[in-house]
Amino acid sequence: MHLTALLLSGCTVNLPAPVTSGDGFFDRPWPSDTRTIDGRPDLSDFPHLGEYSLLSGFIELGESLDGFGTNTPIYFRFDGTLPTGKLPSPEQSMQADAAVMLVNIDRDSPRRGELIPVEWAFQETTTNWQPENLLAVRPVWGYPLEGSTTYAAIVTTEVALLDEDFSAVWAADHPDHATYEPLQETLFQLKVPVDSVAIATTFTTQDTLGDMVAIAASIQQQLPIPILDQELEAGFTTGSFSAYFGEIVVPMWQHGEKPYATEGGGFVMDDAGNPILYGWDRTAFTVTIPVGTQPDDGWPTVIYSHGTGGDHTTFASGSTNVPATLLAQEGIAVIGISQPLHGDRGSGVNPALYSFNYINPEAGRTMFRQGALDQVFMAELMTRRGAVFTFEGQELRLDPERVAYLGHSHGGEVGAKAVPFFGDRIKGAVLSGTGGGLGITLIERNADDFDIQSLITDTLEFDSDEVLDTFHPAIMLVQMDAEATDPINYARYWHRQQPTWESAPMSVLLTEGLLDVNTPPHSTEVLAGASGSPMLAPTAQLATIQELTGLVEEPTPAISNVTGWDGSDVSVGLAQFPDDGHFAIFRNYEAVQLYQTFLSTALEDEAPEISSFTP
């Protein structure tokens, strides 16, 4: 034991030392900017490399990224057992005297010095995938790291011996000093002495939103927007609305041949970073027009985005509780197209299998973003000039000044990514059965259609005592690859934090059923937390982020209850329905009234109202 470490740490005879060298993936801290090739993660020593075909595509994609994950674990290995009783709670980790810290050290970030709350897990024994004495630390769900930003994770001498080789990086002549100098400066800012740092790693996150920013800008500023006006085909009529069918062309940014089963499906940029359009999808749409007198300026309209397995007719057919009926009662028209690979945009395959494409991670990373860009395009199409349809000599007009959004499940997931790009075009958005944090979904999803947990543990030959959780390296790899499509990385830009592109704070109502087996309720709660949206009263359960922020029990009715980044007020919140599952807005009358009121008030050029409800 080094005398220096003894003096710094007091009675430290039982403290372990960090492992900082060796041939294994975990024998050095991960992630680290010293473990990259041309700025891209080096996964060449990932456990069991080449042994499992399921992971091969994820490894290849991971090594193509321009940085590390924003919601992924950070790993430190030690030569003995850590005193875990001294490791911090999430709340304690936000203090500069915590034994483990995660801090923004980016010189160009306005949030440099910000401590991110963390959760941790300690693996004491060796498994097929993890060595003994492995500490995994990650941001609390709902606190995603920002893209293209440098962070540091720190373990102090309170729980581990100081590593003499690592501490040499503080010297200006050390070859890695430039990598760690921003951390050294930030520690000085936080009044944390460098000799209290047992081990640390610095890493730069990937550009999670760059592709979406570029393509959304292309849609809104460069792409020719087609004229939607046309003679509609007859659909069907109910006591509340008439449904019609038409045709639309949608820009396709995914390159390759559908359904992208084993290859293709990615976005392509030119040398200047501009998106390359692959082509146009010609597809059907459904529009429903309420019974009654058409307003002078046309019908206020909701763009509907359906769930996995649905199509452009879903919102208008199936029961009396469909959105077309319920919104027609409020004098609102609804329009929708099929998701990518669904309905007439498919290729005869199961859309669920290839929408969540674990065999071809490149397509899995872009499929839902293509869906989000479809909705950005629809918003542009509907608000730039509206639409004037005809049917048997009758004019059916949609008002371009009054457009809102409703997405359920798959449609909520794509909507969560589209909201930051809607700007002031859309008056408000409702997201039903929508979650963030792919790692949570991989661990907690419990639907009968697909057992993702067994697929992972069986295929990767987990030991009987190996735990599959969000700290596991297999989940880390998938989450890192999927950051660009994870709604959790978009939520801060709904209304809480100003983005770098032109936008406006958005009023957003989220709903969840606590019996949901498709979208884990935990994932919905962390998505709300990431956006800065409060839990509406009555609150039935919380995630850790709500415990830290205190954004709970928001009274209703709630109108303009949160101030956005530009000083404007928005109406936001998450409504919970404890006795409902994935389809709360279709089966619970209180949930129905909630979204009816929210959307109708938003389209009346008023602040959207989140009405009182009894779940």
Where are these regions (language model features)?
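C-terminal motif of bacterial Sec signal peptides marking the signal peptidase cleavage site
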Residues: 9-10
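C-terminal subdomain of alpha/beta-hydrolase-fold enzymes, centered on the catalytic histidine
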Residues: 367-370, 424, 428-615
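Alpha/beta-hydrolase fold nucleophile elbow
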Residues: 394-409
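Short glycine-enriched nucleophile-adjacent loop
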Residues: 406-407, 412-423, 429, 527
